[in-house]
Amino acid sequence: LISETAEMCPNSPYAASKVAADRICYSYFRSFGLDVTIVRPFNVYGERQKSGLYGALIPILVGKALRGESLTVFGAGEATRDFSHVSDIVRGYNLVLNSDKLKGKAINFASGVNTSIKDIAEYIAKKFHVSVIHTPARPGEVMRFPADISFARSLGYSPRVGIWEGIDRYIEWAKSNRY
Protein backbone atom coordinates (compact mmCIF):
# COMPACT_ATOMS: atom_id res chain seq x y z
CA LEU A 1 0.00 0.00 0.00
CA ILE A 2 1.15 3.51 -0.77
CA SER A 3 1.10 5.55 2.42
CA GLU A 4 1.54 9.28 2.78
CA THR A 5 5.14 8.70 3.87
CA ALA A 6 6.11 6.26 1.09
CA GLU A 7 9.01 7.27 -1.12
CA MET A 8 7.76 8.83 -4.35
CA CYS A 9 9.46 7.35 -7.42
CA PRO A 10 7.63 8.62 -10.51
CA ASN A 11 7.81 6.52 -13.68
CA SER A 12 6.62 9.15 -16.15
CA PRO A 13 6.90 12.89 -16.74
CA TYR A 14 3.25 13.27 -15.71
CA ALA A 15 3.87 11.50 -12.40
CA ALA A 16 7.05 13.53 -11.87
CA SER A 17 5.10 16.77 -12.32
CA LYS A 18 2.66 15.67 -9.60
CA VAL A 19 5.51 14.83 -7.22
CA ALA A 20 7.12 18.20 -7.95
CA ALA A 21 3.90 20.07 -7.12
CA ASP A 22 3.56 18.03 -3.92
CA ARG A 23 7.10 18.88 -2.83
CA ILE A 24 6.74 22.58 -3.70
CA CYS A 25 3.68 22.80 -1.46
CA TYR A 26 5.54 21.07 1.34
CA SER A 27 8.51 23.42 0.92
CA TYR A 28 6.21 26.42 1.53
CA PHE A 29 5.10 24.82 4.79
CA ARG A 30 8.71 24.12 5.85
CA SER A 31 10.14 27.46 4.72
CA PHE A 32 7.36 29.89 5.60
CA GLY A 33 5.01 28.01 7.91
CA LEU A 34 2.11 28.27 5.48
CA ASP A 35 -0.96 26.30 6.47
CA VAL A 36 -0.56 23.65 3.78
CA THR A 37 -2.16 20.22 3.57
CA ILE A 38 -1.15 18.03 0.66
CA VAL A 39 -4.20 16.18 -0.62
CA ARG A 40 -3.49 13.11 -2.73
CA PRO A 41 -6.65 11.89 -4.43
CA PHE A 42 -6.23 8.61 -6.29
CA ASN A 43 -7.69 8.12 -9.80
CA VAL A 44 -10.73 10.35 -9.48
CA TYR A 45 -13.67 9.78 -11.80
CA GLY A 46 -17.32 10.73 -11.90
CA GLU A 47 -20.14 12.69 -13.38
CA ARG A 48 -19.25 15.78 -15.45
CA GLN A 49 -15.77 14.46 -16.18
CA LYS A 50 -14.92 14.78 -19.85
CA SER A 51 -13.04 12.34 -21.99
CA GLY A 52 -10.86 13.47 -24.86
CA LEU A 53 -7.22 13.10 -25.75
CA TYR A 54 -5.98 13.57 -22.17
CA GLY A 55 -9.08 12.31 -20.38
CA ALA A 56 -9.22 9.72 -17.65
CA LEU A 57 -9.78 6.01 -18.23
CA ILE A 58 -13.46 5.67 -17.32
CA PRO A 59 -14.71 8.68 -19.31
CA ILE A 60 -12.65 7.62 -22.33
CA LEU A 61 -14.01 4.06 -22.24
CA VAL A 62 -17.61 5.16 -21.71
CA GLY A 63 -17.30 7.75 -24.49
CA LYS A 64 -16.05 5.11 -26.92
CA ALA A 65 -18.75 2.66 -25.84
CA LEU A 66 -21.46 5.28 -26.36
CA ARG A 67 -20.19 5.73 -29.93
CA GLY A 68 -20.26 1.95 -30.46
CA GLU A 69 -16.47 1.73 -30.70
CA SER A 70 -14.27 -1.04 -29.33
CA LEU A 71 -12.57 -0.28 -26.02
CA THR A 72 -8.78 -0.16 -26.08
CA VAL A 73 -6.77 -1.62 -23.21
CA PHE A 74 -3.00 -1.26 -23.11
CA GLY A 75 -1.21 -4.53 -22.48
CA ALA A 76 -3.14 -7.34 -20.83
CA GLY A 77 -5.06 -4.87 -18.67
CA GLU A 78 -3.77 -6.44 -15.47
CA ALA A 79 -2.62 -3.08 -14.08
CA THR A 80 -4.74 -2.05 -11.12
CA ARG A 81 -5.76 1.33 -9.77
CA ASP A 82 -7.56 2.60 -6.71
CA PHE A 83 -10.43 4.47 -8.39
CA SER A 84 -12.18 7.15 -6.35
CA HIS A 85 -15.61 8.56 -7.07
CA VAL A 86 -15.64 12.36 -7.09
CA SER A 87 -18.28 12.53 -4.35
CA ASP A 88 -15.96 10.65 -1.99
CA ILE A 89 -13.10 12.98 -2.84
CA VAL A 90 -15.29 16.04 -2.17
CA ARG A 91 -16.05 14.61 1.28
CA GLY A 92 -12.30 14.19 1.76
CA TYR A 93 -11.61 17.82 0.87
CA ASN A 94 -14.33 18.92 3.30
CA LEU A 95 -12.60 16.89 5.99
CA VAL A 96 -9.33 18.70 5.27
CA LEU A 97 -10.99 22.12 5.30
CA ASN A 98 -12.58 21.43 8.67
CA SER A 99 -9.59 19.87 10.43
CA ASP A 100 -6.88 21.56 12.44
CA LYS A 101 -4.73 18.39 12.59
CA LEU A 102 -3.40 18.38 9.04
CA LYS A 103 -1.06 21.37 8.75
CA GLY A 104 2.09 20.26 6.96
CA LYS A 105 0.79 16.76 6.38
CA ALA A 106 -0.18 14.74 3.34
CA ILE A 107 -3.37 12.71 3.20
CA ASN A 108 -4.49 10.06 0.71
CA PHE A 109 -8.09 9.90 -0.43
CA ALA A 110 -9.16 6.82 -2.37
CA SER A 111 -11.60 3.94 -2.27
CA GLY A 112 -9.17 1.52 -0.67
CA VAL A 113 -10.00 -1.08 -3.35
CA ASN A 114 -7.88 -1.91 -6.39
CA THR A 115 -9.57 -2.79 -9.66
CA SER A 116 -7.89 -3.92 -12.87
CA ILE A 117 -8.13 -1.91 -16.06
CA LYS A 118 -9.27 -5.09 -17.81
CA ASP A 119 -12.18 -5.59 -15.38
CA ILE A 120 -13.36 -2.01 -15.87
CA ALA A 121 -13.14 -2.26 -19.67
CA GLU A 122 -15.00 -5.58 -19.68
CA TYR A 123 -17.72 -4.20 -17.38
CA ILE A 124 -18.33 -1.21 -19.65
CA ALA A 125 -18.06 -3.31 -22.84
CA LYS A 126 -20.69 -5.73 -21.56
CA LYS A 127 -23.12 -2.89 -20.79
CA PHE A 128 -22.79 -1.51 -24.33
CA HIS A 129 -22.22 -4.77 -26.25
CA VAL A 130 -18.88 -3.64 -27.65
CA SER A 131 -15.57 -5.48 -27.74
CA VAL A 132 -12.32 -4.93 -25.87
CA ILE A 133 -9.10 -4.88 -27.88
CA HIS A 134 -5.59 -5.02 -26.45
CA THR A 135 -2.69 -2.96 -27.74
CA PRO A 136 0.95 -2.96 -26.61
CA ALA A 137 1.57 -1.80 -23.05
CA ARG A 138 2.54 1.82 -22.57
CA PRO A 139 6.12 2.60 -21.48
CA GLY A 140 6.43 3.37 -17.78
CA GLU A 141 3.06 1.83 -16.89
CA VAL A 142 2.73 1.22 -13.16
CA MET A 143 1.19 -2.20 -12.56
CA ARG A 144 -0.22 -1.61 -9.09
CA PHE A 145 -1.08 1.65 -7.37
CA PRO A 146 -2.89 0.81 -4.12
CA ALA A 147 -3.61 3.64 -1.70
CA ASP A 148 -3.25 3.32 2.04
CA ILE A 149 -6.17 5.35 3.39
CA SER A 150 -5.75 4.39 7.05
CA PHE A 151 -4.72 7.94 8.03
CA ALA A 152 -7.78 9.40 6.29
CA ARG A 153 -9.99 6.78 7.93
CA SER A 154 -8.57 7.73 11.34
CA LEU A 155 -9.89 11.25 10.72
CA GLY A 156 -13.37 10.03 9.76
CA TYR A 157 -13.04 9.52 6.00
CA SER A 158 -15.08 6.66 4.63
CA PRO A 159 -15.54 6.10 0.89
CA ARG A 160 -19.17 5.37 0.01
CA VAL A 161 -19.35 4.85 -3.76
CA GLY A 162 -17.96 1.56 -5.07
CA ILE A 163 -16.43 1.31 -8.52
CA TRP A 164 -19.36 -0.43 -10.23
CA GLU A 165 -21.96 1.94 -8.78
CA GLY A 166 -19.74 4.87 -9.72
CA ILE A 167 -19.33 3.66 -13.30
CA ASP A 168 -23.09 3.17 -13.57
CA ARG A 169 -23.64 6.73 -12.32
CA TYR A 170 -21.14 8.03 -14.85
CA ILE A 171 -22.78 6.08 -17.68
CA GLU A 172 -26.21 7.51 -16.79
CA TRP A 173 -24.79 11.02 -16.65
CA ALA A 174 -22.98 10.56 -19.98
CA LYS A 175 -26.11 9.21 -21.67
CA SER A 176 -28.34 12.01 -20.39
CA ASN A 177 -25.83 14.65 -21.43
CA ARG A 178 -25.38 13.24 -24.94
CA TYR A 179 -21.75 12.80 -24.17
Predicted regions and their residues:
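Catalytic helix-loop patch of NAD(P)-dependent Rossmann-fold dehydrogenases
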Residues: L1-I38, K50-L53
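Glycine-rich "substrate-gating" loop/helix at the edge of Rossmann-like oxidoreductase active sites
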Residues: N11-Y14, F42-Y54, G75-S87, V113
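Active-site phosphate/pyrophosphate- and oxyanion-stabilizing loops and adjacent acidic/basic residues
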Residues: Y26, P59, E122
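Short, hinge-like loop/turn segments at secondary-structure boundaries
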Residues: G55-L57, F151
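C-terminal substrate-binding subdomain of Rossmann-fold SDR/epimerase-dehydratase oxidoreductases
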Residues: G63-Y179
